[in-house]
């Protein structure tokens, strides 16, 4: 619960910074911002995925709380992919993010749409509904990573 509260504080602080893109003084600030948001999303989605995969006992309330955090943070990283933020700090963003901005945005929008379905599935309170939706969200993550995230860090 303490971690959930810390994540909620992060979300509240990040939301207060919107529009964040205008506040990045240097490219490395944008890179660190988006990496932080992705780290929070991965941690909370990982908890839900663990339940769906049977590695962690299923708890409908905990699943819903974690999904709420992921949904709150899900749109934040996009504000940090502005022009010139491909370099400045070690990161794994491929040049295709900027070359194919429309495709990148479409992939992000698909992720957000699948998250909404995951949220609805979690509200049913059934593990079976959650399992299918977790797989769909994971598929959007993989698709975006395959196209837009490099395997190694670059600067």
Describe these PLM feature segments.
Residues 17-19:
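N-terminal signal peptide c-region/cleavage motif recognized by signal peptidases
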Residues 1-8:
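Bacterial N-terminal signal peptides that target proteins for export
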Residues 8-9, 40:
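A periodicity- and composition-biased signal for non-globular, repetitive helical segments
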Residues 24-60, 66-155:
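Sequence context surrounding c-type heme c attachment/ligation sites in exported
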